[in-house]
Swiss-Prot record:
Keyword set includes Signal: yes
GO biological process, one term: microtubule-dependent intracellular transport of viral material towards nucleus
Protein name: External core antigen
Subcellular location per the Swiss-Prot or TrEMBL entry: Secreted; Host nucleus
Highest classification ranks of the organism: Viruses, Riboviria, Pararnavirae, Artverviricota, Revtraviricetes
Gene Ontology CC, one term: host cell
Annotated site residue numbers, Cleavage: 183-184
Length: 212
């Protein structure tokens, strides 16, 4: 939406800019939130400060390192993979736009203003999108949503009544994984010990009972 408006401002005359503002107002009147289908919202993501999100370069490196095969696959893997593809393509187009502006816009002040807007405002939105979908693929959507809610509660709680440090996403799935892994060995380990302590005669009686 903002990219559409920005393109019109750069390439068109003043009357078209006014028309683009009308179109932008119409688009803003639509209740479109790209996070809704995943159980989140723009407002929920906005609780996280801008410096929380890694740089786009780091996020892209993470996405390609973990999910490159799925991202490049022609098949549909998951809604999160599809959203990642769209965000990556959108950022590539924004970079092309910034490069074009840097080469063709004569006024240095206007050129710097447009490039700064793309990097700061649109860059933050892309960073939020990339972080959200990479985190959902890495930790699970429910864990990420729980984390966003917990951070929102932590931020809204007065400083005197909250822990000194904000919740950390990486600690949530680790606790869950440890618990899940810890249950199965605990169930299996007592049985061999009991078998060793039992006499051979009792083992045979157990095997007969099992055959029946």
């Amino acid at each position: 939406m903002q990219l559409f408006h920005l393109c019109l401002i750069i390439s068109c005359s003043c009357p078209t800019v006014q028309a683009s503002k009308l179109c932008l107002g119409w688009l803003r009147g639509m209740d479109i939130d790209t996070y809704k289908e995943f159980g989140a919202s723009v407002e929920l993501l906005s609780f996280l400060p801008s410096d929380f999100f890694p740089s786009i370069r780091d996020l892209l490196d993470t996405a390609f390192a973990l999910h490159r095969e799925a991202l490049e696959s022609p098949e549909h893997c998951s809604p999160h993979h599809t959203a990642l593809r769209q965000a990556i393509v959108c950022w590539g187009e924004l970079m092309n736009l910034a490069t074009w502006v840097g080469s063709n816009l004569e006024d240095p002040a206007s050129r710097e203003l447009v490039v700064s807007y793309v990097n700061v405002n649109m860059g933050l939105k892309i960073r939020q999108l990339l972080w959200f979908h990479i985190s959902c693929l890495t930790f699970g959507r429910e864990t990420v949503l729980e984390y966003l809610v917990s951070v929102g509660v932590w931020i809204r709680t007065p400083q005197a009544y909250r822990p000194p440090n904000a919740p950390i996403l990486s600690t949530l799935p680790e606790t869950t994984v440890v618990r899940r892994r810890g249950r199965s060995p605990r169930r299996r380990t007592p049985s061999p010990r009991r078998r060793r302590s039992k006499s051979p005669r009792r083992r045979r009686s157990q095997s007969r009972e099992s055959q029946c």
